[in-house]
Amino acid sequence: MNYGAADERWANPPQPVAAAEHGPSFDHSMVSEEYEHDKKKNPAQKEGISFSQALLASGHEKSDGKIKLTARSFMEVGGYAVFLIVLVYVAFAQNSIQSYYYSKVMSDLFVASTGASGAPAFGSCTSMDNIWDWLSQVLIPGIYWTETSNSTDNENMIYYENRLLGEPRIRMLKVTNDSCTVMKSFQREIKECFANYEEKLEDKTMVGDGSVDAFIYATAKELENLKTVGTIASYGGGGFVQRLPVAGSTEAQSAIATLKANRWIDRGSRAIIVDFALYNANINLFCVVKLLFELPASGGVITTPKLMTYDLLTYQTSGGTRMMIFEGIFCGFILYFIFEELFAIGRHRLHYLTQFWNLVDVVLLGFSVATIILSVNRTKTGVNRVNSVIENGLTNAPFDDVTSSENSYLNIKACVVFVAWVKVFKFISVNKTMSQLSSTLTRSAKDIGGFAVMFAVFFFAFAQFGYLCFGTQIADYSNLYNSAFALLRLILGDFNFSALESCNRFFGPAFFIAYVFFVSFILLNMFLAIINDSYVEVKAELARKKDGEGILDWFMNKVRGLTKRGKRPDAPGEDATYEDYKLMLYRAGYAEKDINEAFTRFNVTSMTEHVPEKVAEDIADEVARMTEQKRNYMENHRDYANLNRRVDQMQESVFSIVDRIEGVNATLQTIEKQRVQQQDGGNLMDLSALLTNQVRNRESAARRPTITSIADKKEE
C-alpha cells in the first residue's frame, strides 16, 4: 500500500487542541492581543534538535524568532552541573550530624548541668559567688572523672570517650580602680571607680609577690590567644591565667580555693574566660569549649557559651583521598572559570561587568578563590596545632587560631554554596516559564528601591521610638540593634505584647497598633502589590513572545521522542488495523475526540479490521479538516474576544471622558453662577446708592424754599 499522499500531513501534523466541550479559553487572549495578528493559522510543529546537532550548533536565531540551543549553552550547563556536584560534596563532606551531637553533649555537661551542692547552671550565674560555685561544683567534676572503667584508662577522659587536650585555663581580665571619675558630690563616700572594659584600661599590675602564675599578667602573645567577642565588649587575648592540672581533681579544687581566698575575682574584674579542648577518636572530631562570664560595671553576670566542633584531620581518614580528589577537581574548575572570565573581560572590557550574571560569576570566583586559600590555611593551622599539643605532652593547647581559621573557612564556604545555587537560575531561565521570577524582580527593582526607602524611614522611626521608650525595661529594645530585630520579628508574629503594656500602659499598645497598621497592613501590602503588578506585566510580555528552544525544551523534546508523541507516525503496514491507525494518529498530535468523530463518520465499527488505503487517506483528511476548523474557530473567537475587550476599554475611556467633561461643565456653571451673583450684588449696591442720592437731593430741594421764606421774613 502506498501512503505517499499522506506523508506530508503526517510530517506536519497540527498541534493538539482542547476539546470543544471545554469551550474556548480567554486567558491567553487577554494578555497577548497585540501580537495575535502575527500568529499563523496552522503553525508548523516545533522542530527538534538532536544531541549531535546540539554539540555542533552555533548560536543563532531562526527566522521565526525561536532561539535554538547552542553548543556553548549545552556544554555550559553540563559543566556547571558537574561543578555543582563537586562543590556540594566538598562543602558537606566535613559536616555531619555527629558534630551537633558532640557539641550538645558537652553543652549539657558544662552549660546545662547544676552543681551537687546547689551551684547554679552556667546560664543562671548572676554574681561572683555563683561563679565560684560553678567552678568548683560543675567545671571541676565535669573535667575530672573519678569513676573508672574496666576496659578504659579514663585519665583525662570525659564520658570515657573524650580526651582532654592540654591544661584547662581560667583567664581573668580586669580594669584599674581609676579607670573612671567619680562625681564630686560622691567623692567623699566613693573612693574607687571601675569602668566598663576597654583594652586600654586593663589592669596589668602583679598581685602580691607574684609567687602564683594566676596573679601575674600574661600577654596575648605569650598565651597565643586572640580577642574574645562577648555580649558587652570584645576582650583582649591577655590576662591573669590559672592553669588547671591535666589530671587530678584535688589539685584543681585546691587551686580554685586559693584563688577564692585571695579574692582573685574582685570589683575590677570584667571577664572570666574558661577554655579547653577535647578530642573524640571514635568520630575523629575536636571540640573547642570557651565559656565566658562578663561582669559589667553595672553589676551582675552575663554568660556566653561557645562550643565549636571541627574536623581537623580530614585527610588522615579513610575518605581523605577521595576528599583530596574532589578538592583537586574543584580547583581545576575554578582555574578554568578564571581563564574564561579573563578572556571574556578582555573581549568586552568593562561592558562585561554591566550584566547581572557576569557579576554573579565574578563574585562566585572571588569567594571560591578565598575558600581555596582559607582551606589551605585552616588545614595547615589545624595540623600544626595538633602536632604542637602532642609534642608538648598535652600540657598547653591554645586553639584560638584554629577556631578563627575554621570559622572564616566555614563562612566563606557557605557564601560559595549560596551563590553557586543562585546561579542555577541563569540556566533554568532559558524557558520563558522559568524566567518569570528573574524578570519580575528585574522589572520591579526600581519600584522596590523606592519602596525600600519609604519602608526604611517608617521602620527606623519605630525602632528608635521603641529603643527610647522601652529600652530601659525590655531586653528586646535594649539597644537600637535589638530594637530593629524585635520589629522584624514582630512582622513574623513573634512579639511580647504583655511586656510592652506593662512597660507603658499608653505608649506600649499605641506603639504596637501603629506599627502593625502602618507596616504590616499598609507597607507590606504595598510591597506585594508592586510584585504582583510586575508579575502580571512579565507574564503578559512572555505570553506574547514565541517559545524559544533552550535546554529544557531540548530535554522535553527528547522525552517526548521516547514516547513517540509529536513525531511523524509510521505509515500503517498492510496488516495494520483501525486500532493501530487510531493510535498512530493520536501519537501524531491529533485530538482523540476528532479521531473518534472521524471514525464515526466513516462508519468504522470494528477496530480490528485492516485499514484500506483510500479510507486511511480520507480519515486523515477528515481529522485534519476538523482540527483546522477548530483551530480557526479558536483563532476567530480569540480575535472576537480581543476586539470585544478593546471596545469595552474604549467605552470605559469614553465614559471617563464624558464624566470629566460633565465635571468641568458643572464647575464652569458654578463659576458663572457665582459671577452673576456677584454682578447682581454689585448692581443692587449701585442702585441703592443711586436711590439714596436721589432721596437726599429731593430732601435738599424741599428744604431750600423753606429756608428762603424764613430769610425773607427776617429781612422784612
From Swiss-Prot:
Residue spans crossing the bilayer: 73-93, 325-345, 356-376, 410-430, 448-468, 511-531
Alphabetical GO biological process terms: calcium ion transport; detection of mechanical stimulus; male mating behavior; mating behavior; neuronal signal transduction; regulation of male mating behavior; response to hermaphrodite contact; vulval location
Keywords per UniProt: Behavior, Cell membrane, Cell projection, Cilium, Coiled coil, Disulfide bond, Endoplasmic reticulum, Glycoprotein, Ion channel, Ion transport, Membrane, Phosphoprotein, Transmembrane, Transmembrane helix, Transport, Zinc
Location of this chain's protein in the cell: Cell membrane; Cell projection, Cilium membrane; Cell projection, Cilium; Cell projection, Axon
Effect the entry attributes to changing residue 534 to D: Phospho-mimetic. Acts as if constitutively phosphorylated
Segments on the Cytoplasmic face: 1-72, 346-355, 431-447, 532-716
Spans annotated as Disordered: 1-44, 696-716
Modified-residue entries (Phosphoserine), positions: 534
GO molecular function, one term: calcium ion binding
Intramembrane: 483-497
Disulfide topology: 180-193
Tissue spec. comment: Exclusively expressed in a subset of 3 categories of adult male sensory neurons: ray neurons, hook neurons and head cephalic (CEM) neurons. Expressed in the male tail.
Biased composition regions of type Basic and acidic residues, renumbered to the chain: 1-10, 30-41
Major subcellular location class: membrane
Free-text function comment from the UniProt entry: Functions as a calcium permeable cation channel. Required for 2 aspects of male mating behavior: response to hermaphrodite contact and vulva location. Acts in the same pathway as lov-1 and atp-2 in response behavior.
Protein name per UniProt: Polycystin-2
Gene: pkd-2
